[in-house]
C-alpha cells in the first residue's frame, strides 16, 4: 500500500505538538488593521489549539504529524 500524502496547505497552517495537540495561528490579522485596536491586535498575536470539532479532519490531512 502506498504512503499517505500530507496536505501541504495543512502542514503550512498547523503544527503538531508532542502531547498530541495541534496548534494554529489566529485569524483576522492580515489586513484592515487600522480599525482594530492595539489590544485586539496584541491578543491575536499568539497561537491557539485547534478546536476538538475540527481535530479529526486536521489529523486526517496530516497523517504523520
Curated annotation (Swiss-Prot):
Keywords: Ribonucleoprotein, Ribosomal protein. Residues 1-15, 26-44 have a biased composition (Basic residues). The keyword Ribonucleoprotein applies. The keyword Ribonucleoprotein applies. Residues 1-65 are annotated as: Disordered. GO terms for biological process: translation. It comes from the Bacteria. One of its GO terms (cellular component) is cytosolic large ribosomal subunit. GO terms for molecular function: structural constituent of ribosome. Gene3D superfamilies: 4.10.410.60. InterPro entries: Ribosomal_bL35, Ribosomal_bL35-like, Ribosomal_bL35_CS, Ribosomal_bL35_sf. Pfam families: Ribosomal_L35p. NCBIfam families: rpmI_bact. Belongs to the bacterial ribosomal protein bL35 family. This is Large ribosomal subunit protein bL35. It comes from Ralstonia nicotianae (strain ATCC BAA-1114 / GMI1000) (Ralstonia solanacearum).
Amino acid at each position: 500500500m502506498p504512503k499517505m500524502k500530507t496536505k501541504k496547505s495543512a502542514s503550512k497552517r498547523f503544527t503538531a505538538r508532542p502531547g498530541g495537540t495541534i496548534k494554529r495561528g489566529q485569524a483576522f490579522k492580515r489586513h484592515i488593521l487600522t480599525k482594530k485596536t492595539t489590544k485586539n491586535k496584541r491578543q491575536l498575536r499568539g497561537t491557539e489549539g485547534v478546536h476538538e470539532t475540527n481535530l479529526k479532519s486536521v489529523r486526517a490531512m496530516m497523517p504523520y504529524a
